[in-house]
Amino acid sequence: MEVPMDCPGCENKVRKALEKMNGVHDVQIDIKQQRVTVTGSAEQKKVLKVARNVTKRDICLWSYPYHPESNGYNDRYFKKKFRKRINMSVNGEKVSSYNYHKHGYHGHEHGYYQERPYSGLINPSASSMFSEENPHFCSIM
């Protein structure tokens, strides 16, 4: 989970609350990355609920890869698991039936790492196109 923690006191509070839960075997906290890893047989929804109640902050599931070598794991997993495509649509518009915020997912990543922004959105010459220093600038100006 991605848990915003400011101090060692917050870290201890989160650790104690999660370790008290039934089914939690181990809690690992990386305060630099703001990441909490819970291992055990506890339900994901209950762990999120306890962490949200303790911190009173918005907590989401970790959507970045834990290790760089794990890239591509999700592709292999979903190809094996979901071979048929499920079409959920109403009047041609796709409808989501899953409450991502309640279950700890934010944005559009849903378990995937965040991709880097596309660096070539604006051509470098586009910003100087209407400059007065440019001898070939727009004749309207």
Swiss-Prot record:
Binding site for a metal cation: 7, 10
UniProt modified residues of type Cysteine methyl ester: 138
Record carries keyword Phosphoprotein: no
Xref: SUPFAM superfamilies: HMA, heavy metal-associated domain
InterPro entries per record: HMA_dom (IPR006121), HMA_dom_sf (IPR036163)
Top-rank taxon, per record: Eukaryota
Similarity-based family: Belongs to the HIPP family.
GO molecular function, one term: metal ion binding
Keywords assigned by UniProt, alphabetized: Lipoprotein, Metal-binding, Methylation, Prenylation
Residue numbers with lipid attached (S-farnesyl cysteine): 138
The HMA domain, residue ranges: 1-59
Removed propeptide positions: 139-141
Function: Heavy-metal-binding protein.
One Pfam family per UniProt: HMA
Protein's UniProt name: Heavy metal-associated isoprenylated plant protein 29
Protein source organism: Arabidopsis thaliana (Mouse-ear cress)
